[in-house]
From Swiss-Prot:
Cited function: Acts as a chaperone.
Phosphothreonine PTM sites in chain numbering: 198
Organism in which the protein naturally occurs: Haemophilus influenzae (strain PittGG)
NCBIfam families listed in its UniProt record: PRK00290.1 (NF001413), prok_dnaK (TIGR02350)
Highest taxon of source: Bacteria
Region (Disordered): 599-635
Compositional bias per record (Low complexity), positions renumbered to this chain: 599-617
Inducers of expression: By stress conditions e.g. heat shock.
Similarity comment: family membership: Belongs to the heat shock protein 70 family.
InterPro entries for the chain: ATPase_NBD, Chaperone_DnaK, Heat_shock_70_CS, HSP70_C_sf, HSP70_peptide-bd_sf, Hsp_70_fam
Family matches, as PROSITE patterns: HSP70_1, HSP70_2, HSP70_3
Gene: dnaK
Full protein name: Chaperone protein DnaK
Amino acid sequence: MGKIIGIDLGTTNSCVAVMDGDKARVIENAEGARTTPSIIAYTDNETLVGQPAKRQAITNPKNTLFAIKRLIGRRFESEEVQRDIKIMPFEITRADNGDAWVNVKGDKLAPPQISAEVLKKMKKTAEDFLGETVTEAVITVPAYFNDAQRQATIDAGKIAGLDVKRIINEPTAAALAFGLGSSKENQVIAVYDLGGGTFDISIIEIDNFDGEQTFEVLATGGNTHLGGEDFDNRVIDYIIDEFKKEQNIDLRNDAMALQRVKEAAEKAKIELSSAQSTEVNLPYITADATGPKHLALNITRAKLEALVEDLVASSIESLKTVLKDAGKGVSEIHDIILVGGQTRMPLVQQKVAEFFGKEARKDVNPDEAVAIGAAVQGGVLKGDVKDILLLDVTPLSLGIETMGGVMTTLIEKNTTIPTKKSQVFSTAEDNQSAVTIHVLQGERKRAADNKSLGQFNLEGINPAPRGMPQIEVTFDIDANGVINVSAKDKNTGKEQQIRIQASSGLSDEEIQQMVRDAEANADADRKFEEVVQARNQADGIAHATRKQIAEAGDVLSAADKEKIEAAVAELETAAKGEDKAEIEAKIEAVIKASEPLMQAAQAKAQQAGGEQPQQSSAKDDGVVDAEFEEVKDNK
């Protein structure tokens, strides 16, 4: 059995970690970075993930997808999705099942399918480090994710070829990373997690007793559509509005210009965490009849803070609610942990410190803590990490719709999971032979105001006056926060149950098709990589051979020289194509044709006093391999 890796599947960046001995280790990706941009780009030839995708975003805005986590498990008609449609350069479309999907080059792609590309990159990163196949993972989600969003994340893992052993809440994972090995007997911490697209706040109690650590989540809350992307959008709007005032041109109508503004806005926001002002300079951003237009704008930290202060204030309101739910006062919080890149903003740190009356901890890496905690949980599940008990909670209340369109709650929010709860209901009409169980998630009294998770029928109820049949409804939530619901007629013993999969979710058949597509793409990607390697080798051989012709070609016969140059030319032509076998055949042809060149080079070296020549790659594979390896390492 291999390792269980921990993956922080973030809105803006993702991170992967694994237990290395008794410590969790963050793994660097192929580009040498510890985090990977959660960006996916579809080009004519391949699918790019991470930094390569980000680099080409400006020239390919409609097919470069980012912040997909904000769409996962969401309905197309939802307010959040409709807001995103107005600002995203790519096309968000309505799927047949009512979900928000993305249209790329005429193909409709589901958010779990797109997110799976990032998970595959994380999986490959871990496999390259461990030197073995990875099939199991713990994946983190925002604590405030509802059931549909959790299911969609598990689906993304399946499509990526991962068995998702556990879904763990991001603040809980950060607490695990912070508290692992702590010797303090009892402490209550607040985890304030403001990431790229989501916000969570959790109050967690860490107990140490007789060598065992217990991490108990007392309460959690948040907003699954508040994060760094929203901060970026405020800056984007400001830049575009200022340019429109000056030039009377709306850059929102130009996808490429909008992508340039987005990159500049994110860069300006980051710079203003350490500087008091920054310049946004985008030459040739657009043009009109009078000629090209340049965008130049100074943004101060004070201006940025004015643009986003209401976003920060809304997060502080959530803090008050969660503290109340946890039954704790501000003075009872021992430590504050800041997680997520947006917490680097001085205004965020200031407002959190003002609320708690103390500074947050500075020794927790906001970009890596969640992945580290996920790896720790993987170690717990594997049995490699012992004496840790994790008690998480369900973030939202669960219940069913009852007479009058009311939501009757069976499981209150912030109930420790896994949990099981039953309640007996009855019929609303005389001789009713069936009941519909409509499962809801949320805090509103009116059923229609809550999230519908699905519904099912219990049929075959014996005719009886209203109120007489006894229908026992049971909610069972597993450790992933995924819900099973059953209804049983206590008189007849008939039972019906479902594992909640919202009507907006992917069917098993769709998931399996996406898994097959992913496997097919993986094979295509492998073949593409092999062709690139062959091209690199061909380029190295052609370069080295031409160099040696220049150095020793004067002692070659005209026929030999012409033959070698023709072979090199054919190799260079083959290297422009997609046929790996042809490229390799042309490499062999150059090596064979270059034998007289090698002999001439040796003869010339002996005449020069025995000095060893620079050997042709045609005879010395070491030279070629070194050149090829160097190219590979620099990727």
